[in-house]
Amino acid sequence: NKTSADATVTNGNSCYSLAGATYNVYQGPNATGTPIATFTTDANGHAELPKPLANGVYSVKEIKAPKGYKLDEKVYTFSIDGRDANLDVQDDPGTLALQVIKKDSNSGQTPQGNASLAGAVYQVSYQQNGQTIVREGTTDELGRVLPAFTRIPFGVITVQEIKAPEGYKLDPSIHTYTISPNNPGVTDFYELEPEDLTEEVIRGGVAIEKRDAVTGKTPQGDASFAGIKFDIV
């Protein structure tokens, strides 16, 4: 009988299934040599050997984890002495460490002017154990939320900026990601694409009025203010 090692992560989440775990059975206690039998769990995590075993000591090892779970490397031993043997095992569910990194929409990780990538507050939401979990994190000067958001179940995750850093506009978008154990390249650590979380710097205009030093306003004689160029540095 197989169960989840952390049901709060897997309960009600279709990204996890107890079906499809495959085990090899070996003669002796060390799970070595040629397997004498193989069995696969059903949706309830239950499996039975296809035929009875003779009395003796046997070992079992998982060779394929079910969807959403980590492979269990442990070797389990049991003995047959004329009675049925029951074996209870658990698999650890896979989870994500979510790294949020923000960038300037034009310059990348270099803030413009007096703006700063530090101080942006992000809200991460996801479903776990029948509840909506909401967590918050604040960016550092490189635009990173540290530490990363850890122990997030596979599934739908939303990320939203709720406070912009100094000198930048608030990003009102709700960014939604669906991350499953079947996504190519998904490991325990998942970094959100920085291009999704860019900041637009707040810009202001400049008005210049040139005046005559003597009259205080209009030019003298045939002089003219027209065509004068200014450099803004």
Protein language model regions, located:
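Solvent-exposed loop/turn and edge beta-strand elements of beta-rich ligand-binding domains
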Residues: N1-V233
